[in-house]
């Protein structure tokens, strides 16, 4: 009976002395955007969509693009700062063209994590 109590105490002590497990976050922070910039776009659609072709054609931008195209975008420079928000689609875009009128190579991101 006494040996069971000692074994229990030893197990409890060894568990208490064990270092905590290290957790590594492999996700890219939401306020960072790989090789592009965080934008708030009124509209985001596939580059092959008719709506995107209608925007890209008159601006002399190649229409054989792939991926997502954001239109009427504005930069979100200070993500996480009070008052910074996007009521439309938040995206990470690699190429900002025509002063944000059209952004190419966009990927949707979630700032509400």
UniProtKB/Swiss-Prot annotation:
Residues 1-23 form the signal peptide. GO terms for cellular component: extracellular region; fungal-type cell wall. Disulfide bonds join 33-92, 40-86, 41-73, 93-106. GO terms for molecular function: structural constituent of cell wall. InterPro entries: Hydrophobin. Disruption phenotype: Leads to retarded growth and displays denser aerial mycelia. Slows down primordia formation, leading to fewer primordia and subsequently fewer fruiting bodies. Pfam families: Hydrophobin. Keywords: Cell wall, Disulfide bond, Secreted, Signal. The keyword Disulfide bond applies. It comes from the Eukaryota. The keyword Secreted applies. Belongs to the fungal hydrophobin family. Aerial growth, conidiation, and dispersal of filamentous fungi in the environment rely upon a capability of their secreting small amphipathic proteins called hydrophobins (HPBs) with low sequence identity. Class I can self-assemble into an outermost layer of rodlet bundles on aerial cell surfaces, conferring cellular hydrophobicity that supports fungal growth, development and dispersal; whereas Class II form highly ordered films at water-air interfaces through intermolecular interactions but contribute nothing to the rodlet structure. Self-assembles to form functional amyloid fibrils called rodlets. Self-assembly into fibrillar rodlets occurs spontaneously at hydrophobic:hydrophilic interfaces and the rodlets further associate laterally to form amphipathic monolayers. This is Fruiting body-specific class I hydrophobin fbh1. The lineage of its organism: Eukaryota, Fungi, Dikarya, Basidiomycota, Agaricomycotina. The gene is fbh1.
């Amino acid at each position: 009976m006494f040996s069971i109590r000692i074994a229990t105490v030893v197990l409890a002590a060894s568990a208490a002395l064990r270092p905590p497990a290290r957790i590594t976050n492999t996700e890219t922070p939401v306020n960072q955007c790989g090789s592009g910039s965080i934008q708030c776009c009124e509209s985001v659609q596939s580059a092959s969509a008719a709506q995107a072709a209608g925007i890209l054609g008159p601006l002399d931008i190649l229409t054989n693009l792939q991926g997502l195209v954001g239109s009427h975008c504005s930069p979100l420079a200070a993500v996480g700062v009070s008052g910074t928000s996007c009521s439309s689609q938040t995206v990470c875009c690699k190429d900002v063209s025509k002063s944000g009128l059209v952004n190419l190579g966009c990927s949707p991101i979630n700032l509400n994590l």
